[in-house]
């Protein structure tokens, strides 16, 4: 599980039909063991291996179909987060990393709070409630005035 508080930015080095390779300058990610869960843009991926400064993930067709990973190409930036531990501050909210769908940004109001409006396609919105939490690209966000339309 994760918290939705990003602790590193990754860079897509390559993507093919069933694999993603990511680099990061953050030493926390260097030398991790195979099998470690890592949140990549909010999707829980299992590290296949770490070599030559790259995180390598095997990715299923299901994951590509439901997540932003289908849009990855070389040099795209990704949000990374290591899994929460028993001593991790839960500054965001509990995030499983099991992604159901993607959303589309429909409006951005730039002010002190930068209000972003999203449209969730084909999503059961009854679970999106005012002052509840959602995770977008791995970032824990608070819902304000959800419009169920």
Where are these regions (language model features)?
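Conserved loop->alpha-helix
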Residues: 1-149
């Amino acid at each position: 599980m994760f918290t939705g508080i990003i602790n590193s930015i990754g860079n897509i080095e390559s993507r093919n039909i069933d694999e993603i390779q990511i680099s990061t300058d953050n030493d926390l990610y260097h030398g991790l063991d195979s099998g470690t869960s890592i949140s990549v843009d909010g999707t829980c991926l299992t590290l296949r291996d770490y070599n030559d400064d790259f995180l390598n993930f095997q990715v299923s067709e299901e994951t590509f179909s439901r997540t932003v990973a289908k849009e990855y190409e070389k040099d795209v930036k990704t949000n990374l987060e290591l899994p929460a531990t028993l001593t991790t501050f839960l500054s965001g909210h509990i995030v499983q990393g099991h992604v159901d769908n993607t959303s589309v940004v429909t409006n951005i109001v730039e002010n002190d709070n930068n209000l972003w409006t999203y449209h969730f396609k084909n999503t059961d919105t009854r679970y999106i409630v005012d002052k509840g939490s959602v995770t977008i690209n791995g970032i824990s966000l608070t819902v304000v005035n959800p419009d169920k339309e």
